[in-house]
Design a protein with these regions (language model features):
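Loop/turn elements at helix/coil->beta-strand transitions in domains of secreted/extracellular proteins
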Residues: 56-61, 126-132
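Short, intrinsically disordered, charge-balanced linker/junction segments flanking boundaries
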Residues: 106-118, 170-172
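A taxonomically broad motif for mature regions of secreted/extracellular
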Residues: 63, 105, 120-123, 127, ...
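Feature captures the catalytic ectodomains and active-site-proximal regions of enzymes
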Residues: 111, 122, 126, 130, ...
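Alpha/beta-hydrolase-fold catalytic nucleophile elbow
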Residues: 64, 135-136
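Acidic, Ser/Thr/Gly/Pro-rich low-complexity segments that form flexible
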Residues: 140-172
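Conserved nucleotide-sugar donor-interacting segment of glycosyltransferase catalytic cores
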Residues: 45-50, 116, 126-129
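Conserved SGNH/GDSL esterase-like catalytic core that processes O-acyl groups on lipids
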Residues: 1-106, 141, 146
């Protein structure tokens, strides 16, 4: 905390991408107090990411949430807990793996809407007839964070050709 108070925006952005957000975070009132990236564009101190998105009355949406439900565990080196079988999101740490049933429940609410036991009626992205594209969890082993490039990955011919070109144009 650096002592800076952010004034809420009057209207939401069209792009509601929030780094670090997990599926269930999109419905938590006041999530900006937990995530400084969302705090910068939340419309109120008690706003939800989904609520701000729905305030735009979307006719088309893209929704790619879920990667952080497992990715934070993977990128932290396995520091966290696999919460499979534990539906209590209040017990989850930042690097914990979200229970698959919890993920399914929240993802369904985000897209289709419904009733949440604590947050009440939730209007989902597709509930008012909006069309969209959805994505969920990529294979974490295929993301750039876990993809290695071997030492000296360029073929010798390419290196020699590049050196010749540099010499030709006086850069070497």
């Amino acid at each position: 905390n650096i002592g800076v108070t952010l004034t809420p925006q009057a209207t939401a952005y069209n792009n509601m991408g929030v780094p670090g957000a997990k599926s269930f975070h999109l419905l938590i009132p006041g999530y900006g107090s937990l995530n400084p990236y969302y705090a910068r564009h939340a419309t109120s101190p008690t706003a939800t990411v989904l609520g701000d998105a729905m305030s735009k009355n979307p006719t088309f949406f893209t929704n790619w949430i879920g990667a952080n439900d497992v990715l934070s565990y993977a990128t932290s080196g396995g520091i966290g807990v696999d919460r499979t079988g534990n539906p209590n999101i209040a017990a989850y740490g930042i690097n914990d793996i979200t229970d698959p049933q919890v993920f399914e429940f929240y993802y369904n609410l985000i897209i289709n809407g419904g009733v949440h036991p604590n947050f009440g009626t939730v209007t989902g992205l597709a509930q008012n007839g909006a069309k969209g594209v959805v994505a969920t969890v990529p294979s974490v082993t295929s993301i750039p964070y876990f993809t290695t490039v071997p030492y000296n990955a360029l073929p010798a011919e390419a290196t020699a050709t590049n050196a010749s070109a540099l010499q030709l144009y006086g850069f070497l």
